[in-house]
Regions:
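Short secondary-structure junction/hinge motifs that connect adjacent elements
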Residues: 1-3, 15-18, 109-111, 130-132
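Conserved binding/catalytic microenvironments
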Residues: 78, 83, 90-356
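Short amphipathic recognition helices of helix-turn-helix/homeodomain-type DNA-binding modules
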Residues: 3, 11-77
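Long, contiguous hydrophobic alpha-helical segments, chiefly transmembrane helices and signal peptides
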Residues: 1, 22-25, 40, 145-146, ...
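Short acidic, glycine/proline-enriched loop segments that cap or flank alpha-helices
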Residues: 10-13, 300-302
Length: 356
């Protein structure tokens, strides 16, 4: 906190006083003031409600008919005027998240979602609702993944539920299936990988005729990773089968994303990294070749994903008893995880550290 404050020329209490404050905040004996909340939000990747243990639901306001009709009229014009701006803002937040991590984006993302939820609430006809709901579905999955990365699992789960509802409102099985597939990772991280597998398989059965080949490949790769997390001979076989299916489904078109599904980044290079991750979890010796190939071709702007590659290489070297190489990659994984503030990868780094 002191380093953060010094960099921004903020006046805060001494180190000794801060230790007392932190203890009292944790025990509920002292309220978090606005000044310290502004510092803690980007440091912890938490919302005001999470810091203060409050309900985020706003108090209803007693608005009259004039105000209601004004909001409805404003929302009716949004699909033509504001939706492109919503999409551009989501893309900017996605880029910032990919390169710098999610912890410093909590306020921006919450404000972004609130604006779209407000617009959707007062959009009446399907023609006005669908574009806003589509934008909200994509932004909500991004917000959910950011929350999961920050260790805010309750917020992550609720954001995925918001994304699914928005996708249903948008009549978009693509965004619905993607939200279900990502939500499965919350279950896996919570210790329910078998339930996660069932959810991602259900996502693949959600209007498959309307899913793009890239989305189908993404869901198959997610199933492979989650099956590997369950373990056991049957799930190992299922993981390998799902990997083969992902490889067969992924279009060889040189593209990374679909124009109508911008939430997914997946090409042959990304799938190679994913395959290496799954094979490392299965203890397969061929994981090493896949992972080093992925590392050589990795996009440096995918900072968090590169931390994952180094974690996977650590795991692969540990399986072969190559401790020096494992330590080298673990150190790189730790540096990248700290750079993005990823609680999720920091946790994985600590688990791997315990095996050295």
């Amino acid at each position: 906190m002191q380093r953060f404050a010094e960099q921004r020329l903020l006046d805060i209490a001494s180190a000794a006083s801060l230790k007392t404050y932190v203890s009292e905040w944790e025990n509920g004996r002292r309220a978090v003031t606005d000044r310290y909340a502004a510092i803690l939000r980007p440091l912890l990747g938490a919302t005001d409600a999470e810091l203060r243990g409050e309900d985020e639901t706003p108090e209803p306001q007693a608005d009259g008919y004039t105000d209601l009709l004004g909001r409805i009229d404003a929302a009716g014009s949004l699909s033509q005027s504001m939706v492109p701006a919503f999409l551009a803002q989501t893309e900017l937040l996605r880029t910032m998240d990919r390169q710098m991590g999610a912890t410093g984006l909590v306020d921006q993302m919450n404000g972004h979602l609130a604006a779209m939820e407000e617009a959707l609430t007062f959009a009446v006809l399907p023609g006005a609702r669908r574009p806003i709901a589509t934008a909200l579905a994509g932004a909500s999955t991004l917000a959910a993944w950011q929350a999961l990365d920050a260790g805010a699992v309750d917020r992550a789960w609720r954001r995925y539920e918001l994304a699914k509802k928005a996708a249903q409102d948008a009549e978009s099985p693509l965004y619905l299936a993607h939200a279900m597939g990502e939500q499965a990772y919350v279950l896996a991280d919570a210790g329910r990988p078998q339930l996660a597998v069932e959810l991602v398989r259900d996502a693949q059965r959600t209007h498959p005729e309307r899913q793009s080949p890239r989305l189908k490949a993404w869901l198959a790769a997610a199933e492979a990773e989650l099956c590997a997390a369950v373990g056991g001979a049957e799930m190992e076989s299922a993981a390998r089968t799902a990997l083969e299916r992902a490889t067969a489904l992924l279009p060889d078109d040189g593209e990374v994303r679909d124009a109508d599904m911008l939430s997914i980044f997946l090409n042959t290079g990304h799938l190679s990294r994913w395959r290496g991750n799954v094979l490392a979890k299965l203890g397969d010796a061929s994981a090493m070749e896949e992972l080093y190939a992925s590392l050589r071709s990795a996009d440096e702007t995918f900072v968090r994903a590169n931390s994952g590659i180094h974690c996977d290489l650590t795991q692969a070297h540990l399986a072969r008893g190559e401790l020096d190489e494992a330590r080298t990659h673990l150190q790189k994984a730790r540096l990248l995880a700290n750079r993005t503030g990823s609680v999720r990868y920091r946790r994985r780094v600590e688990l791997l550290t315990g095996r050295l």
